[in-house]
A protein has these predicted regions:
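Juxtamembrane and boundary regions of transmembrane helices in multi-pass small-molecule transporters
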Residues: 7, 208-211, 215-270, 275, ...
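Interfacial loop-to-helix junctions that mark the boundaries of transmembrane helices
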Residues: 45-48, 69-81, 114-117, 150-155, ...
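Structural signal for alpha-helical transmembrane segments and their membrane-water exit/capping regions
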Residues: 48-105, 126-140, 174, 258-259, ...
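Core transmembrane alpha-helical segments of multi-pass membrane transporters/permeases
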Residues: 79, 83, 91, 106-141, ...
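Juxtamembrane helix-boundary/capping and inter-helix hinge elements in multi-pass membrane proteins
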Residues: 100-102, 116-117, 196-200, 225-237, ...
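Membrane-interfacial loop-to-helix junctions in multi-pass transporters
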Residues: 117-123, 147-165, 192-202, 270-278, ...
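Hydrophobic alpha-helical transmembrane segments of multi-pass integral membrane proteins
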Residues: 124-133, 153-187, 361-400, 417
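Alpha-helical transmembrane segments of multi-pass membrane proteins
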Residues: 157-170, 196-213, 369-382, 406-427, ...
Length: 487
């Protein structure tokens, strides 16, 4: 990071005393902008200021209050909540800017440059590609082929473990937990009806499988957010993350076997097409080869469109409409990422980021404590917003500072951010995944949570591996990691 922005190397102690040498790119932009005007837009308080966190607290409070009143986490759209927080941030900044001799234009410029961070803009386009891929794959029949192939190959008494594994494969291929829940719940409900299994149990298994890919997939928005905010390569984060969740996968699979019962599933109605699997195979293979995610998803999208048109799933016109639908389904998330970037820039100027960083690290004396503080931060943000991507984007800059301060590998930091945010979404009764499963199955969200075994075990093993410092051997050379990720 130091080499990238041309800053002079600073010591750990000096890091928090030089706004130009630390933190995300928005701090550099703020300072450069102020320098051009002969002013330094610095918060002036090296320990930070709690006022800088008020916009975020207002957002969380509004979200929790609206959810508590209506019982629906979707009552207040995230973009509206963040917009309100941004308005308050500008109000709080106005007084400080006046005292510092800066104008409203300076705040707007800093906000725009915070939202225009190269990491966020790249993330913006990757999110749009992920939405296009999801809609194209669904429209040309790839989703149904993947699900049916898995069920057809499994013995009847392995249906429940198989449902979990199919959820893992499907979510890893699609990169979306919501898409996986939507695709598998109809199958899960049918299995429950035929075998007499508990509906909440089946819902919990589907959600568990969905959260596997949400956490690990190369095209998951959480993976994209975690790796881009920490400036590490996806394959490095995948290796570290997979080792940390592997015990949770194994134990969940074993629990499914014990809960499973013989089922007479009519497999003659399950059809699949080998050619339709190509987009999923392509995106997984290219990603594992280290091909940039934009190129990997682009190739898979083109393959899906070509196959869909050739098989009659799309016409040229409907293919374009499907691409448009994909953009629409992710444009909210993409826009929110940019809004959060601008909000965090203003919060940083107010001293909120430094205050939170100071409080989180005040009593931290080791890399282990730093990792636990990062895990706690992203989990709390996720439970409050029920959006693991936004929680990672918000916590990412702070986590990067903490990891640099205590020599924690950014690869490990990215893994912790993604693991704990996904685990939080997988057990939160008002999160979208559980709400979707409960709505389709007609059961209570709270009845599903105890059966979300994988997400619960993610918490258990995530904390356990932080405490024992495993997996070992991860590079702590964060500058080198950043250079690799930038290529």
């Amino acid at each position: 990071m130091v080499a990238r922005f041309g800053c002079q190397k600073t010591t750990t102690k000096e890091k928090h005393h030089c706004a130009y040498s630390i933190g995300p790119p928005y701090r550099r932009w703020i300072v450069e902008n102020a320098k051009r005007k002969g002013k330094i837009m610095d918060n002036g308080n090296k320990k930070g200021n709690f006022i800088g966190l008020l916009p975020l607290i207002i957002f969380i409070a509004l979200y929790i209050i609206s959810t508590a009143i209506t019982g629906d986490a979707g009552t207040m759209p995230l973009n509206v909540g963040i917009l309100i927080a941004i308005i308050f941030a500008f109000i709080f900044c106005r007084k400080k800017c006046k005292a510092d001799g800066l104008k409203f234009d300076d705040m707007v410029t800093s906000f725009c440059k915070g939202g225009g961070d190269d990491t966020l803009i790249l993330m913006f386009f990757i999110f749009l590609e992920a939405g296009i891929f999801y809609c194209v794959a669904g429209g040309m029949g790839a989703v149904a082929s993947v699900s049916n192939l898995g069920l057809k190959l499994l013995p009847a008494n392995m249906v429940l473990p198989g449902l979990f594994l199919i959820g893992c494969v499907l979510s890893f291929s699609m990169g979306t937990s919501m898409g996986t829940v939507t695709a598998l719940m109809p199958i899960g409900i049918d299995i429950a009806a035929k075998t007499g299994m508990s509906l909440p149990l089946v819902c919990g298994i589907v959600v568990s499988g969905a959260m596997f890919g949400d956490n690990l997939s190369f095209i998951s928005d959480t993976t994209i957010a975690a790796t881009r905010t920490q400036e590490v390569q996806m394959k490095d984060k995948f290796k570290a993350n997979f080792l940390m969740v592997l015990p949770a996968v194994i134990i969940t699979f074993v629990l499914c076997i014990f809960q499973s019962s013989a089922a007479s599933l009519d497999k003659s109605t399950l059809t699949w097409n080998l050619v339709q699997l190509l987009p999923y195979v392509l995106v997984i293979v290219l990603s594992l080869m280290g091909v940039h995610v934009i190129l990997a998803m682009g190739a898979a999208i083109v393959a899906g469109l070509v196959i869909g048109i050739a098989q009659g799933s799309f016409t040229l016109v409907t293919a374009l409409a499907t691409v448009g639908d994909g953009i629409k389904c992710m444009e909210d998330t993409a826009a929110i990422a940019v809004m959060v970037g601008g909000l965090v820039a203003l919060m940083s100027y107010l001293g909120g980021i430094d205050w939170l960083l100071n409080k989180l690290t005040k009593r931290v004396k080791s890399s282990r404590g730093a990792e636990l503080s990062i895990a706690a931060l992203v989990t709390l943000l996720d439970l409050a917003t029920t959006n693991n991507t936004i929680s990672i984007i918000t916590a990412g800059p702070i986590a990067k500072d903490i990891s640099d301060e205590f020599s924690v590998s950014r690869v490990r930091t990215a893994s912790i951010l993604d693991l704990f945010s996904s685990a939080g979404n997988g057990v939160c009764p008002w999160a979208g995944q559980i709400l979707a499963a409960a709505g389709l199955a007609g059961v209570s969200t709270l009845s599903i949570v105890p059966f979300c075994w994988y997400s619960i075990l993610m918490f258990v093993f995530g904390i356990f591996f932080i405490l024992i410092g495993w997996p070992k051997g991860l590079s702590s050379n964060n500058a080198k990691n950043a250079e690799k990720a930038a290529k």
